[in-house]
Amino acid sequence: HGVVSYAIGNWPPPWGIEYRVDGLSSYVLILVSAIASVVLPYSRASIAAEIEPQQHYLFYTMLALCLAGLLGMTVTGDAFNIFVFLEISSLATYVMVALASDRRALLAAYQYLIMGTIGATFVVIGVGLLYLMTGTLNLADMAQRLAPLRGTRPVLAALAFLTVGLSIKAAVFPLHQWLPNAYAYAPSAVSAFVAATATKVALYVLMRYYFTVFGEPQVFARLPMQQMLLVLALAGMFGASTVAIFQTDLKRLFAYSSVAQVGYIILGLSFGSATGLAAGIVHLFNHGVTKGAIFMLLGAVAATVGGTGL
């Protein structure tokens, strides 16, 4: 029934922070909330086998923080608020990956931390450039003020920084190097939750910036974004799928499969059409549900046979 808007602290937008829920954000909210409601009861047995007992409280704390960050990114209508929630969810995810009893999880979490920090830096630079040009952080107000500024170099630079930063967070090929180890060595409950939600919310934010803030003409007319996204999508689809064939561990195999599936979603965006965007949004939900279920299944397999090696 339209857009739901809530002004934090009773400060009306664009002066205050606005929570703004429309059809797309409610769609992603349902995905994240549904996955969390399934992973939480599943995690009880998973962490008992894969995380030291004295660290169980850390897992539940970080899961709650990560969920809060992902939901916040989805509902907020403020550009800097998106960055804050992005960092909250990312920092919680780094800790959850490192909680696994396998020592290789520490290296995986460190790799994720380094690449995630680079991505967050690019995002905040992009937000800073947009604030410099528009004088506002409210996404709806920013979209209106950007209309006469299309084609200016700071705005195009902001578009580039946001694209690279969010592509790292979404594991778009070739910025996916953090993902295979993080998914493979994290506890199964963490792999299931992160694979089903974290990259999907990053893709949602990318869509939100492309089609709500910048607008389609800005994204696809001023820069060769369609061609670039198309090449990266195809490379991810075929490259990651090929690498997955040669994996000897099921969690790593499906981690590379996730990179390929992100390529399918980016392929939909690269068309620059309503049909392509709709296809990407549908597959975003589809991939979140199926990949979360697959990693929960792999956790059950690991608990039964003692591992996920082929």
Regions found by a protein language model. Name each.
Residues 1-61, 140-144:
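Transmembrane helix-loop-helix hairpins at membrane boundaries of multipass inner-membrane proteins
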